């Protein structure tokens, strides 16, 4: 996230629009999620004043310290959890976030579903796919993504709307994004959260609906 806030946001939005127009692929619009981890509360204000409303946070505790006060001033903020979630943080996550992008195992799915039932919320959720099958990364195996997503719906009652991935560092991202798009079609999960600062234009070419830029 750049210190020259309005210019940085405008530049990214223009690149997103240009990529979308160039490739002519669905969806109708690509959503920019500004990755705000490590930035303090007041550092967010210029982005909010410049019109940015979608933000991604990696840690529940950090988000708790930052966003409640900002939400009182900017009530239309949409907050996405894009980092790993522990089951003992499910209650806090459901209370604070609007979208959960990192559902990757049954224990988390059940913890989220249980808390949503308790408070009467139904948050949109993404299945996180370990698209490169990397040992150090979270996410379900690509071969299990479709069945896991269906299980999240049928057994846990989650509202699975899409898939999310982070491709391997140093590898051309296009084939991984294409693979995620194919899995999303099979899973009947129309939203695709893929693409970050260095590769979001490639992700848009493959059908990304959400890009995460920080």
What are these regions (language model features)?
Residues 1-198, 204-206:
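Conserved alpha/beta-domain cores
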């Amino acid at each position: 996230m750049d210190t020259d806030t309005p210019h940085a946001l405008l530049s990214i939005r223009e690149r997103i629009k240009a990529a979308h127009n160039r490739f002519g692929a669905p969806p109708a619009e690509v959503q920019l999620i500004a990755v705000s981890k490590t930035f303090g509360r007041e550092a967010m204000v210029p982005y909010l004043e410049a019109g940015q409303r979608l933000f991604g946070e990696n840690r529940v505790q950090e988000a708790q310290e930052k966003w409640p006060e900002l939400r009182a001033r900017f009530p239309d903020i949409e907050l996405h959890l894009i980092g790993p979630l522990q089951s003992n943080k499910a209650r806090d996550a459901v209370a604070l976030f609007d979208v959960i992008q990192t559902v990757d195992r049954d224990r988390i799915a059940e913890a989220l579903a249980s808390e949503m039932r308790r408070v009467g919320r139904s948050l949109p959720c993404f299945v996180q796919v370990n698209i490169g099958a990397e040992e150090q990364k979270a996410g379900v195996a690509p071969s299990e993504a479709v069945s896991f997503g269906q299980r999240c719906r049928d057994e846990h009652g989650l509202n699975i709307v899409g898939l999310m991935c982070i491709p391997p560092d140093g590898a051309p991202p296009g084939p991984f994004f294409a693979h995620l798009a194919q899995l999303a079609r099979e899973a009947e999960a129309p939203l695709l959260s893929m693409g970050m600062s260095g590769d979001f234009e490639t992700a848009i070419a493959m059908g990304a609906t959400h890009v995460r830029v920080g």
